[in-house]
Amino acid sequence: MEITFFGTGAALPTKERNTQAIALNLDPYSNSIWLFDAGEGTQHQILHHSIKLGKINHIFITHMHGDHIYGLPGLLTSRSFQGGENKPLTIVGPRGIKNYVETTLQASLSRLNYPVTFIEIDDQLHYHHEGFTVSAYNLNHGVPSFGYRIEAPTTSGKIDVASLREIGMEPGPKYQEVKNSDSFIFNDKVYQSSDFKGEEKVGPKIAIFGDTMPCENELKLADNADLLVHEATYIDGDRSLADSHHHSHINDVLHLLEATNSKQALLNHISNRYNLSDIDVIYAELQNQYPNLKFKFVRDFDTFEI
């Protein structure tokens, strides 16, 4: 799996950062791409990447602030002409996302040539698709704002070809039965499939947060995650400014990373008060403060394997 950041700034687009948009490539589990938020200019950012709009089959919106949704109407209409025709799309988000999309399309006299399903969240959500589990919990941002926990499916262990050949089974269609069942019959004898394949591989767990100040539901979302994607709007000074705007201070995020035993954090939604050189200096200081934690401030178009 890969995660790509098409927008890493907060509130307003700048020359260095676009507003929020994150793409999650589900390969090798699925041929799909999921998009998290679609700030202004998202479709233009995607033009600079190999991702095609037609492959996006889910869009998850964290909350209804403009820097997270202003790019959605244009992206939806462009999808009609960029490989999305007749390909269903599911949009998940806070209550109001359906009205926002339908109103903007109606006002601009736009029509989509593919079906759209809306799932609106009031408090929490547990959603299953193609073996993935998505859990959403309300955060604390002054408006309904959600974080999403994505759990990839567990995959079967690799077939032990040498062991199967020892019992006389050569590679062929029968191997799929060994891979996908608990037991199989070969030459009138019953075998346990687990004796002929490696251990199951648990899929990665990813938590993608909307804007928030610290709250209890963050712990549920981040628990033992392989990756946290979290806002870092305020990365220096005291936390009073972060609190007054219902955002997190960088120390809150790193404490969350540590408390939940998560493996690493990618930090985005960075205020335009910080330029790139400011961030480099602050990052070096934070690495000295938290030497045992793995974290990184991301930039537009950064891609990471999960």
Curated annotation (Swiss-Prot):
InterPro entries assigned to the protein according to its UniProt record, in alphabetical order: Metallo-B-lactamas, RibonucZ/Hydroxyglut_hydro, RNase_Z/BN
Q: How does it assemble?
A: Homodimer.
Q: What is its EC number?
A: 3.1.26.11
Name the CDD domains on file: RNaseZ_ZiPD-like_MBL-fold
Q: Where is the active site?
A: D67
What is the enzyme's class at the highest EC level?
A: hydrolase
In its keyword annotation, does this UniProt entry include Hydrolase? yes
Q: Where does Zn(2+) 1 bind?
A: H63, H65, H141, D211
What's this protein's name? Ribonuclease Z
Keywords, A to Z, come to:
Endonuclease, Hydrolase, Metal-binding, Nuclease, tRNA processing, Zinc
Positions bound to Zn(2+) 2: D67, H68, D211, H269
Task: Write one Gene Ontology MF term.
Answer: 3'-tRNA processing endoribonuclease activity
Function field: Zinc phosphodiesterase, which displays some tRNA 3'-processing endonuclease activity. Probably involved in tRNA maturation, by removing a 3'-trailer from precursor tRNA.
- Which metal ions or organic cofactors does this protein require, according to UniProt? Zn(2+)
Protein's UniProt keywords contain tRNA processing: yes
Provide the family line.
Belongs to the RNase Z family.
